[in-house]
Amino acid sequence: MSIDTIEKPPAEQPLPQIADKKPETAEKLVIFAWSGELDKLWPTMILATTGAAMGKETTVFFTFWGLFPLVKNEIRLTGENWMQKMLSMMNRGGDQHMKLSKMNFAGAGPAMMKHLAGEHHVASPHELMEMAKELGVHLIPCQMTMDMMGLKREDLIDGLDEPAGATMALAQAQGAITLFI
C-alpha cells in the first residue's frame, strides 16, 4: 500500500464541528497514592490541593508504600510481628524521611530537592498536606494495607479521614478524574 492508494475525502465535505461541543468535566478527583517516595508524594499533593482549589471534590487514597508518609515522623518502629517490624525499620515512615525514587544519593538527593524547592518557593509535601486538610481534601489510608503492614491509627498523623478499603476508593472514583501515582 502506498500513499497514492489511500482514498482521500472529497474537498467539499465539511469537517465536523467540534468547537460547539463543550467538554464534560468531572467534578471529582481521586488520586491513588501508591508510592511513598518524595518525588511521587510531591506531585500527588500538588494535584490534590490544585483540584480542591478548583472546586473539585478531591480524595487521596493512600495504599501500600504510599501509607508511609502518613506515619508520624517521631514513630520509628511499628508492627506486631518481626516481619512488620523489619518492614518499618527498613522503610521509616513520616514525611521527613522520604527518599527519591531516582538519584537518592544516600539521602543527599532529597536534601537537594528540598533546597531547590525552597529557593523557588515551592511548598513542601508537609505544607501541601496541611493545605490539603484545610481545603477539605479527603486523605484516606487503606485499612487492608495498614493491617498487613502492622500500622495502627495512632501511628498516623492527625487530620486524616477514617481508614477504608478499595471498595470505597473505587466507589469514589466513579465519574471522577482518576490518577494512580
Task: Report the location of each language-model feature.
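Short internal beta-strands
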Residues: 58-64, 140-143
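Short hydrophobic/aromatic patches at helix-to-coil boundaries
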Residues: 178-181
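Histidine-anchored nucleotide/phosphate-binding helix
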Residues: 42-55, 60
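Glycine-rich loop at the start of a catalytic domain that most often binds anionic cofactors/ligands
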Residues: 70-80
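A glycine-rich helix N-cap at a beta->alpha junction
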Residues: 78-117, 121
